[in-house]
Amino acid sequence: MILNASGCLDALEAPDVARALDAFVTKTVTPLPREGNRPVRIAETEAGMLNSIGLENPGIESLLAEKLPRLAELGVPLWVSVGGFAASEYAELCAVLDDRPEVTAIELN
């Protein structure tokens, strides 16, 4: 199975790439919007790259209202990546997404 890493592909900006995958994984979403970390977010090292974006995202309500319907139109299985700071936040997100027929799987970040 070939899929993207969460946050590495905007399927709405590159739909042909997303459609070529076996499944598309969304950028991680949290219960509330997050601005993420201040720059510098990415550093190159001899061993590779390090990143610490800080889970910047618009929150679950925005994902459900704005992005999820458009992502479902791509016709590729949709995995939603969720993040939280407590087990209850993960449970809340999973419960909301479990009721959505367009969501094929949930990734815990």
Residue ranges, per PLM feature:
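Alpha/beta enzyme core
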Residues: 73, 87-109
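N-terminal capping/small domains of soluble enzymes
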Residues: 1-77, 83-85
